[in-house]
Every structure is written in structure tokens, then in C-alpha cells.
Amino acid sequence: MKILISPSKTQNKNIDSFSNNEENILFTNKTNELNDLLIKSINNEKFNSWLELKNNSLIEETIKDIKEFKNNKAYKAIEFYDGLQFKNILYSQLSETQKTKLNESLIIISGFYGIVFPNSYIKPYRLMLGSKINIPNYKNLYDFWFKEFNQKLEELNPDKLIINLASGEYSKLIDNSIFNVINVDFKLFKSNKYVSLSTFSKQCRGYFINQFLNINLDINKIKDLDILGFKFNNELSYKNNYIFTKAY
């Protein structure tokens, strides 16, 4: 079984867990190919929109990271990604046994690296899977990654069971014809209807992982979890879609 999540745009370079080289990376050649393409694309008028760069500081930092990619430091992924989802995994509070289980079970889907493990060492990047960047011989980044990503995921996951916590953007990369995918979602009951709110969803995805580790990744106990007040909703859930809800 593997747990799949999206990466975070927010990244933290001010951490102690870094290396001079990438580690535990599966698709080095494809990542280098993408960075070479980004270098060639810097002067393209669409470059900023491709990478969702909205201020001069971020533009300058991103271009610097791209140009100096080969010499940049690499950071431990589980600490480097710094968004709400990752904060709510509460990694520093996990036992060593739980950290080992996390490394064995969690996969972070990346538009730049393809597959990232919690203990992978990765370099700063900005390329998201939904980017519209032009890639020679491919329709888009989904097309660029789809075959190799799913082949490797199948190798890593022989029982083909996936707990999917990834966003819609990243879930598109998973070949549902190969895997038995359980999608987990969180909805608030607000104004007489159930809605998904990004902030709550990100927090809950991270905390779900924390709590899943607390029950030793027992798939049969998922429905009993309390995720920041969100509880399994039997009426809204269907087939392999597990919906957790709470009142706003």
C-alpha cells in the first residue's frame, strides 16, 4: 500500500537536513531534462505564468534556482515542503518507527521529480504538474510523466492499493486502470451544503497521515479516524471514495 499526496509550493531552505547532492531520486535524467528546458524558457513571455510567479522577488529566486540547479543544496523532502499539509503531518513528533513507516509508505507526486519520498533529498524548484510549459514531443507534463510514473509506482506497490490524498491536479497522474485507489476527501457542511475548502483540506490531509500512522496503517480502521473534527460520512461516501465531514 502507498499513500499519495501533492507537493507544496511553499518550501523551506532554512533547515538543517540538507546535502550537497540529491538522494533517493528515481528519475534524475528526466528532472535534468526539465531543468534544461526551463533554462531555455526563461526569456519566454509566458515563463512567469507557467510557473505562477507573481512578484519580482519570487521571479528572481526561481530563475536563480534554475540556473544554479546543479550546484544548489538538496533538502530532505519531508522537512523542505512547508505547506499546511506537511506541517500537519507533525513529522518532528513522530516516533522513529513511525518515521520509518512514513518513508516506506508515503509518495509525494512531483511535476519536477516525478516521485519523491519523505527521505528524498531534493533541490528547490517551482514547476507544478499542471504547468502549461511546452515540452518537445509531449502534450504536457502529465504526458511527460505518465508512463514512467505508473510503471515505477507499480514496482514499488505490488499489492496495487493506494490511499489517495492528492489534489485533483496531481490525482490525474494516477492510472486508475492499474491500481485500487481509495480517494479520501474532507468536506464542511456550510450554508446547508457540503463544500471543500482548500485550507481545511490541506490541514486534514496532513493530519490524516499522522493519525493513519497512529493506527499502524491499518486500512480497516480508517473509517474510525477523527481528523481535526472531521469524521467518516457513510451517506456521502461511495465505493472507494471516503468522505469525512464536519459542520462549519
Swiss-Prot record:
Residues spanning the signal sequence: none
Domain of life, source organism: Bacteria
InterPro entries per the UniProt record, alphabetical: YaaA
A cellular-component GO term for this protein: cytosol
GO BP: any one term: response to hydroperoxide
Pfam families per the UniProt record, alphabetical: H2O2_YaaD (PF03883)
Entry's family note: Belongs to the UPF0246 family.
Stated name of the protein: UPF0246 protein MYPE6270
Species whose genome carries this gene: Malacoplasma penetrans (strain HF-2)
Top-level taxonomy: Bacteria, Bacillati, Mycoplasmatota, Mycoplasmoidales, Mycoplasmoidaceae
